[in-house]
């Protein structure tokens, strides 16, 4: 029989791999499976926090939407919301914002014009391509000049249609203002769960890199997002093509249309033959 430590590890793995927008449903199921609720409570704080930050869940504040991300984490329950220039306190267990304060001191003012320009373009980009998406843009100085980190997360949950999904992308853009190129390294994660008469999940992680010219703050941001948009569109197109190919080949191969002798069985003839045999007894 599994030890309590092993049970906690199994439960943690279930929770961290919960499908998009279905975390609390999985929590309820795991709670019912464990012999004692104390086993779940023992690791809930760290597990819930890991799930929320890795999934970049969106939350509502008094000033609008924000993301809970590792990139914006100040402490275990405080997260920078640079767009609204505030720090939010988030209760990972209750899944709600419990406080807000000014972000003065948390934002590097000497590069804020670049961060703000990227933030503006990120908002436009989300509005155009991810209507349910939320973005967060962080900025800091590095040896290479400026590093802008763009986080985008969008989730859809359609239980009546038996599916849910989340798109997450993190782009790290480094450049020297006004000279050279912007190098943007992206990590895109797509998770889809389909659960009508079964349980099928897609989990894909893709690394991308783009370059774009660096100029003034606004032009730098516009050029960077043109390159990012092209890279994400190519990924989206590739996923669509792969699924089309899988539907026409791979999935069909899982269920053989003809038996091994390549001849269809006449089930009506077999049925009639069986009935005739029964009548002749």
Curated annotation (Swiss-Prot):
Q: Is Cytoplasm among the key words of this record?
A: yes
Q: Which GO terms describe its molecular function?
A: actin filament binding
Q: Where in the cell is it found?
A: Cytoplasm, Cytoskeleton
Listed InterPro entries: CapZ_alpha, CapZ_alpha/beta, CapZ_alpha/beta_2, CapZ_alpha_1, F-actin_cap_asu_CS
Give the signal sequence positions.
none
Q: State any GO BP term from the record.
A: barbed-end actin filament capping
Report the domain of life of the source organism. Answer: Eukaryota
- Name any GO cellular component annotation: cortical cytoskeleton
Read off the Gene3D superfamilies from this record: F-actin capping protein, alpha subunit, F-actin capping protein, beta subunit
PROSITE patterns, alphabetized: F_ACTIN_CAPPING_A_1 (PS00748), F_ACTIN_CAPPING_A_2 (PS00749)
Keyword Cell wall biogenesis/degradation in the entry? The reply is no
> What's the main place this protein lives?
cytoplasm
Which keywords has UniProt assigned to this entry? Answer: Actin capping, Actin-binding, Cytoplasm, Cytoskeleton
Name the job this protein performs: F-actin-capping proteins bind in a Ca(2+)-independent manner to the fast growing ends of actin filaments (barbed end) thereby blocking the exchange of subunits at these ends. Unlike other capping proteins (such as gelsolin and severin), these proteins do not sever actin filaments.
Q: How does it assemble?
A: Component of the F-actin capping complex, composed of a heterodimer of an alpha and a beta subunit.
Would you tell me the protein name for this molecule?
F-actin-capping protein subunit alpha
| Organism expressing this protein natively | Dictyostelium discoideum (Social amoeba)
- Name of the coding gene: acpB
């Amino acid at each position: 029989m599994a030890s309590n430590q092993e049970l906690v590890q199994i439960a943690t793995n279930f929770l961290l791999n919960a499908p998009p927008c279905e975390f609390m449903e999985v929590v309820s199921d795991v709670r019912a499976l464990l012999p004692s609720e104390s086993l779940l409570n023992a690791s809930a704080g760290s597990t819930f926090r890991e799930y929320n930050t890795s999934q970049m869940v969106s939350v509502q504040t008094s000033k609008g939407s924000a993301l809970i991300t590792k990139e914006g984490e100040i402490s275990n329950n405080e997260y920078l919301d640079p767009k609204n220039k505030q720090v939010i306190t988030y209760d990972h267990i209750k899944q709600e914002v419990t406080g807000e304060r000014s972000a003065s001191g948390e934002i590097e003012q000497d590069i804020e014009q670049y961060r703000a320009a990227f933030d503006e373009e990120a908002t436009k980009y989300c509005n155009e391509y991810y209507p349910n998406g939320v973005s967060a843009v962080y900025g800091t100085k590095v040896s290479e000049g400026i590093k802008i980190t763009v986080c985008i997360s969008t989730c859809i949950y359609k239980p009546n249609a038996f599916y849910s999904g989340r798109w997450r992308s993190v782009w790290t853009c480094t450049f020297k203002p006004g000279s050279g190129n912007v190098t943007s390294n992206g990590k895109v994660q797509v998770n889809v769960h389909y659960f009508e008469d079964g349980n099928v999940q897609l989990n894909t992680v893709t690394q991308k890199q783009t370059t774009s010219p660096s100029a003034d703050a606004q032009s730098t941001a516009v050029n960077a997002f043109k390159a990012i948009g092209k890279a994400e569109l190519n990924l989206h197109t590739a996923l669509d093509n792969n699924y089309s190919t899988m539907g026409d080949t791979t999935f069909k191969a899982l269920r053989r249309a003809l038996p091994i002798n390549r001849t269809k069985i006449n089930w009506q003839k077999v049925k009639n033959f069986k009935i005739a045999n029964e009548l002749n007894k």
